[in-house]
Swiss-Prot record:
Gene3D superfamilies: 3.30.70.330. GO terms for biological process: translation. It comes from Acorus calamus. This is Large ribosomal subunit protein uL23cz/uL23cy. InterPro entries: Nucleotide-bd_a/b_plait_sf, Ribosomal_uL23-like, Ribosomal_uL23/eL15/eS24_sf, Ribosomal_uL23_CS. Its main location: plastid. The keyword Ribosomal protein applies. GO terms for molecular function: rRNA binding; structural constituent of ribosome. The gene is rpl23-A. Part of the 50S ribosomal subunit. It is found in: Plastid, Chloroplast. Keywords: Chloroplast, Plastid, Ribonucleoprotein, Ribosomal protein, RNA-binding, rRNA-binding.
Length: 93
């Protein structure tokens, strides 16, 4: 499953790392239970809670045609104490 797009590194997400909370963008069609099951299976950790919100798409325009970028969902995953996951870094070329 490739539901997790990439990890998010903002001031808030870096601050939340101290509380054992990890932030990442996921596909908008993914559900909380799918992401929770995938994180627990892939990383071998226990998830306590998950918070999510949808990010607004940005407006784009090409000539007379107006559109918007794809919407993403941002998940904040809280792990049990003692567990951690490595940062999800997308390799960009």
């Amino acid at each position: 499953m490739d539901g997790i797009k990439y990890a998010v590194f903002t001031e808030k997400s870096i601050r939340l790392l101290g509380n054992n909370q990890y932030t990442s963008n996921v596909e908008s069609g993914s559900t909380r239970t799918e992401i929770k099951h995938w994180v627990e299976l892939f990383f071998g950790v226990k998830v306590i809670a998950m918070n999510s919100h949808r990010l607004p798409g940005k407006g784009r325009r090409v000539g007379p045609i107006k559109g918007h970028t794809m919407h993403y969902r941002r998940m904040i995953i809280t792990l049990q104490p003692g567990y951690s996951i490595p940062p999800l870094i997308e390799k960009r070329t």
